[in-house]
């Protein structure tokens, strides 16, 4: 998806484009939480199926339909778009082909594999994804620990952080594009998320305070996620873009497995989610450090690997 967007949007508009597309994630959390809760409670036993089975059927079928629609309607690149005039195609391709003020970009996949900056970005993305997925998976449990036991009520409460995240994502992407800055717009929200997650255990027993802290932390992590992807898209260009972005994405997305799993291990070992929240905070803080220290220019990397 990131590579596809990089073929349509130049570096100057990339953060906002990413925000508009990936805001679907938090919106899915807003709609999906209450909808899933309603499906599981209302359709349990209908047709001999459990509530969770109906949930997978009802929520999975639209994905299949949208997949078919995308296949037949989206063009691979501006030159293939039937809805653009020749002049519009030329303008879009000129913007995408521009370097956005970055004189040195990685243009070959072999250079991607040799460049330490790519691996630093991969690890930073891992550290961003780790708490995002952990929060998504464990949020209902965290709220249950504060006394929320009704399934439908739990679904509505779990949607609140994603409303904030959707708004924060768009605001972060818009401002990052407006000022032309990426690193701090990704790193500082990650640092804020780390601080919020670290103090959340101290609010245990207070539902409103816990939900407020988790909401703010979720919004900050999604802000960091949104602007992060504008960094590699400005660095990796040409034939290397697909492979380079895929490499960062593949390494980083493994955090989506380790995040929820690690919180489960910590809870099993300690009997509490507090340690898991602190682990999420550490990962968010590490992502901040990795992004801020990723200052070495691609030109320097080229000179070193030449």
Give the label of every model feature segment.
Residues 29, 235-272:
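A late C-terminal transmembrane helix in Major Facilitator Superfamily
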Residues 112-173, 225, 229, 259:
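Extracytoplasmic gate region of multi-pass secondary transporters
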Residues 53-72, 277-292:
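Symmetry-related core transmembrane helices of the 12-TM Major Facilitator Superfamily/SLC fold
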Residues 35-47, 143-144, 175-177, 262-271:
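Interfacial helix-cap and linker-helix signal at transmembrane-aqueous boundaries
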Residues 1-9, 223-237:
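Intracellular juxtamembrane helix-capping segments at the cytosolic ends
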Residues 181-231:
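C-terminal transmembrane helical hairpin of 12-TM major facilitator-type secondary transporters
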Residues 15-40, 62-63, 249-259:
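Glycine-rich segments within core transmembrane alpha-helices of 12-TM secondary carriers
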Residues 1-23:
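Cytoplasmic helix-loop-helix junction between adjacent transmembrane helices
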């Amino acid at each position: 998806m990131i590579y596809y967007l990089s073929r349509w949007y130049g570096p100057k508009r990339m953060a906002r484009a990413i925000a508009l597309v990936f805001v679907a994630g938090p919106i899915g959390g807003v709609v999906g939480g209450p909808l899933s809760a309603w499906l599981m409670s209302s359709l349990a036993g209908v047709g001999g199926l459990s509530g969770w089975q109906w949930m997978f059927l009802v929520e999975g079928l639209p994905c299949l339909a949208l997949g078919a629609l995308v296949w037949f309607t989206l063009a691979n690149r501006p030159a293939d778009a039937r809805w653009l005039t020749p002049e519009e195609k030329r303008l879009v391709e000129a913007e995408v082909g521009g370097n956005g003020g970055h004189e040195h970009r990685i243009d070959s996949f072999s250079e991607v594999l040799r460049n330490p900056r790519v691996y630093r970005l991969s690890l930073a993305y891992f550290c961003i994804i780790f708490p995002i997925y952990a929060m998504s998976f464990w949020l209902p449990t965290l709220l249950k620990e504060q006394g929320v036991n009704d399934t439908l009520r739990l679904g509505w409460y779990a949607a609140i952080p994603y409303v904030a995240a959707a708004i924060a994502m768009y605001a972060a992407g818009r401002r990052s594009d407006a000022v032309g800055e990426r690193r701090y717009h990704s790193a500082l929200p990650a640092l804020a998320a780390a601080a919020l997650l670290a103090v959340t255990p101290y609010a245990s027993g207070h539902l409103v305070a816990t939900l407020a802290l988790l909401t703010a932390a979720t919004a900050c992590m999604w802000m960091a996620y949104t602007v992060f992807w504008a960094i590699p898209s400005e660095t990796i260009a040409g034939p290397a873009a697909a492979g380079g972005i895929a490499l960062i994405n593949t390494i980083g997305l493994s955090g989506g497995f380790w995040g929820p799993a690690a919180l489960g291990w910590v809870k099993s070992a300690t009997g509490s989610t507090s340690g898991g929240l602190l682990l999420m905070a550490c990962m968010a803080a590490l992502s901040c450090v990795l992004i801020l220290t990723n200052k070495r220019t691609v030109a320097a990397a080229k000179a070193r690997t030449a």
